[in-house]
Every structure is written in C-alpha cells, then in structure tokens.
Regions:
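Glycine-rich active-site/cofactor-binding loop and its immediate structural neighborhood
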Residues: 90-129
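Oxyanion/phosphate-interacting regions
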Residues: 1-34, 194-196, 203-309
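General beta-strand structural signal in soluble alpha/beta enzymes
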Residues: 73-77, 105, 212-217
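N-terminal subdomain of lithium-sensitive/metallo-dependent phosphomonoesterases centered on the IMPase/IPPase/PAP
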Residues: 1-99, 303-308
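Acidic beta-strand-loop-alpha-helix segment within the catalytic core
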Residues: 113-223, 277-309
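Short, Asp-centered acidic motifs that coordinate Mg2+ and/or phosphate
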Residues: 73, 127, 232-233
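Residue-level signal for inorganic ion chemistry
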Residues: 24, 54, 65, 142, ...
Length: 309
C-alpha cells in the first residue's frame, strides 16, 4: 500500500539537518585530530560537556529554521525558550538539541543532532528529525501526514528511505538492551545494581547460548535504533533524560509502532504540556525516566526486573 508523501515541513527539516551536519563534520574531525576540543564552561548544565561547536550549531539552527518556519518558539538545550518571528504566540515550538554526545563528537566517535516540531494547538509533535553525523544511516525521521497518520523512516547517506514499522518481539533473554552508562557514578554504578535485569539477560537460550546483550547508546538516537530494529530496548532509570534528549526519539519510536513507558508502566504521552512559553521553560528543566522497547511485552518484562534505586 503506497504511503502518503512526506509533508513539505519534514522534507525541509531533513535538508536543514543534513546541511548543518555537513558543515559541522569537518570541524569536529579537526577537533579530534588536533586535540583542540574548544570546551566552554557550561553555566546551564554544570555536569555536561559543552564546546564552542554546540553553541555554533545552536546559532546556525536558529538562522536556518527561520527560513522555513516564519514564527515559532525556539527551545534549544543551549538557551531559554525564545519567540522567533512576528507572531507573539506562535503555534509551533521547535525543540532542538544542537549537538548530542558532544564530548564524543569532538573526538569524531559519535555525534547526533535532534530537531522536533511540536504543534501547541494539536498538543503533540508533527515532525522530528534525528541526525547521525558520522554514520551511513544518517537520518531518522517521523512526520504526521495530512490525514493524521504518522510514519517513520531511516535515510542512508545517499538518500535512500527505509520505512520503519516494528512488528516483532523478542524475549528479554535474547534482547539487546541499551543504556546511557558512560558516567561511572551517576549511571554505570546504578546499572550494576540491577541484578535481576542482568540475570535475565544472561539466561540460556533454548539453543544453549547466552544471547542477551547490554550495550551503550545515547539520547534520542537510542530510541531511533529501536525503531529501526537495530536494538530491542533502552532503559533510563537513574538520572532521567531531559526533554530535548528524549522527545524526538520518543516521537519517532512511537510512529514506528514501538513503546515508551514510565517506570510505573504507563505510556509516556506525546502531549508535552507546551501550553505557554513559561510551560516550555519548565519542561526544559525536567527529566524523565523510561523504558523504550520494540514491543509492549518486552517493555513490561524489563519493568518487572528493575529494582528501585
């Protein structure tokens, strides 16, 4: 069955994100090879690495977004929400994480960039693009079409689209479960305390091998990897993700028929309560724990193994 064409907005967003990635990639490679990481003091998020590249991308996104969206609320990780354009109360809010995993991006290892467009009138996202700066699978996207249906795709560097729609489930003992475990005290140590989860992942399969795996993943792209079928689940139970880390991947995974639950087992809604600019600012200061998975049975199984920390 043919799918409706993607809306102009998301096609424009894809071109915009690819442009920004093409511009920043050589700068990041030069930073990695030279060792000049251009780190800046992070006044907004003291525990997070911040480079001049993050700030440059923040400004570049604002410049380019203003060419395709006349009026919007610009909600970037790197600044307070700001109204752009002539409309004093625009419908659209554009949520941006200019450079996710920047401490690895300046080492030319991993780097991602997130854009989500949210309709305050509809109280839900209408488009999201997650870009992978260094890999061949370059873009993950989701968009709402004119009929109200939602579709998710991955695009390779040559522009080939791959529809994303999850229909399978795997038992936890055969799943690849990821977690952002890079920070030893805040994230890795709490993960080591999840003994039931680790035991379930280490169970023997019917064929006799141990097929469960635990991996590392990052921000929204971790949920996109589930949407594409590359991984099976992602968990965040320690510190929680900020909305710019979670929301774009949440929308893409939801459009691909995946699930995102809170730690009480309830689906996390796509209504982010962006009713006013003040509300957007409040949402930017909150964090959410979650279980994201390719299927509800897998998410619920993981939930039952997690121990309160």
């Amino acid at each position: 069955m043919p799918q409706p064409p993607l809306p102009t907005l998301v096609r424009d967003l894809v071109r915009l994100v690819v442009t920004v990635m093409d511009e920043i990639r050589p700068r990041l490679l030069q930073a990695a090879l030279s060792g000049e990481r251009s780190e800046s003091r992070n006044h907004r998020h003291a525990d997070n690495f911040l480079s001049q590249h993050d700030l440059w991308m923040h400004e570049r996104y604002r410049e380019l977004l203003s060419k395709i969206i006349p009026s919007y609320v610009y909600a970037s990780e790197e600044a307070d929400p700001q109204i752009i354009g002539d409309d004093p109360d625009p419908d659209l809010c554009v949520l941006v994480d200019p450079l996710d995993t920047s401490e690895l991006a300046v080492r030319a290892l991993y780097g991602y960039t997130h854009v989500l467009v949210y309709s305050r009138q509809l109280a839900r996202p209408i488009a999201a693009v997650v870009g992978d700066i260094f890999h061949h699978v370059q873009i993950y996207l989701a968009a709402r079409d004119t009929t109200g249906g939602e579709h998710a795709f991955a695009l390779t560097r040559d522009g080939t689209p791959h529809p994303l729609h999850l229909t399978r489930t795997v038992p936890l003992s055969q799943a690849l479960v990821t977690n952002y475990l890079m920070k030893p005290a805040e994230r890795f140590h709490p993960l080591t305390q999840q003994t039931r989860l680790l035991q379930e992942l280490g169970q023997l399969s019917p064929e006799g091998g141990r097929r469960g795996r635990l991996g590392v993943d990052f921000g929204s792209v971790g949920l996109c990897h589930i949407a594409a079928g590359f991984t099976d689940a992602m968990i965040e139970f320690a510190k929680g993700f900020a909305i710019w880390d979670l929301a774009p991947g949440h929308y893409i995974l939801n459009a691909a028929n995946g699930v995102v639950l809170d730690l009480q087992g309830q689906p996390i809604p796509l209504d982010y309560r962006f009713d006013t600019v003040t509300d957007i600012g409040k949402a930017m200061n909150q964090r959410r724990t979650f279980i994201a998975a390719s299927s509800l049975p897998l998410a619920e199984t993981i939930l039952h193994t997690l121990q309160k920390t």
